[in-house]
């Protein structure tokens, strides 16, 4: 599991501003994930505390944005956000815990990796991970809450980059084209070549491919 985060600003990082960008009197972080559905690769989560003094134009659900726009916004978020953290849960953790619990684990790691301590975490979806701070689940939050939109972009871009790197090691699967999702191309490659160590054995199509090569 790798976590990246933006250092806290200010003199020695001793103080935190009171933010009212998402909720008056709260320091809010938005949290989202990428990669619950794919057959391969980690699940990635991000947590973002936006800076109301440095607004970012064009934030939206990462799935509604082109790859080019996601990359541009990724660069803006890491520069202008007050704090951000990106974390993951591995394929091994997905297979041992199940994808839901692995996703919650990645989200927890992302929030705990923030250099600014939030008072409220707004989570995309209908479930919240176990956190030491208050949390709120918001269905469709990645299109409604700017900090969640920012988190969705960081998580998506980070994971897509990971899968491009995996493609360099395992070009036969086409990870750069489908990011590990169960496309016809990917399923055909699974049948032809069998799974690699980055495939999720707890997912049915991968299990079936393992059975074919036994």
Curated annotation (Swiss-Prot):
CDD domains, sorted:
RNase_HII_bacteria_HII_like
Q: Which UniProt keywords apply?
A: Cytoplasm, Endonuclease, Hydrolase, Manganese, Metal-binding, Nuclease
* Taxonomy, superkingdom: Bacteria
What's the chief localization of this chain?
cytoplasm
CC cofactor note = Manganese or magnesium. Binds 1 divalent metal ion per monomer in the absence of substrate. May bind a second metal ion after substrate binding.
PROSITE patterns recorded: RNASE_H_2
- Locate the RNase H type-2 domain: which residues? 26-214
Q: What is its EC number?
A: 3.1.26.4
Which Pfam family, just one, is annotated for this protein?
Answer: RNase_HII
Top-level EC class: hydrolase
Reactions catalysed, semicolon-separated, are:
Endonucleolytic cleavage to 5'-phosphomonoester
UniProt record similarity statement: Belongs to the RNase HII family.
Q: What is this protein called?
A: Ribonuclease HII
Q: Which organism is it from?
A: Burkholderia pseudomallei (strain K96243)
């Amino acid at each position: 599991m790798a976590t990246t985060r933006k250092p806290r600003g200010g003199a020695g990082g001793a103080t935190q501003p009171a933010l009212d960008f998402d909720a008056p009197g709260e320091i809010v972080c938005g949290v989202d994930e990428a990669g619950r559905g794919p057959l391969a690769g980690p699940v990635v989560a991000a947590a973002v505390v936006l800076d109301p003094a440095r607004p970012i134009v064009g934030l939206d659900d990462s799935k509604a944005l082109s790859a080019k726009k996601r990359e541009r916004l990724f660069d803006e978020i890491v520069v202008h956000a007050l704090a951000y953290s990106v974390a993951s849960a591995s394929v091994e953790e997905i297979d041992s815990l199940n994808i839901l619990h692995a996703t919650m684990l990645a989200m927890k790691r992302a929030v705990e990796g923030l250099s600014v301590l939030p008072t409220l975490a707004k989570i995309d979806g209908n479930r919240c991970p176990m956190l030491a701070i208050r949390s709120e689940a918001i269905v469709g939050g990645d299109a409604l809450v700017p900090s969640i939109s920012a988190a969705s972009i960081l998580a998506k871009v980070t994971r897509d980059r990971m899968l491009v790197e995996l493609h360099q090691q395992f070009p036969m699967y086409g990870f750069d084209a489908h990011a590990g999702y169960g496309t016809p191309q990917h399923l055909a490659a699974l049948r032809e070549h069998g799974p690699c160590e980055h495939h999720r054995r707890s997912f049915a199509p991968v299990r079936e491919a393992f059975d074919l090569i036994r």
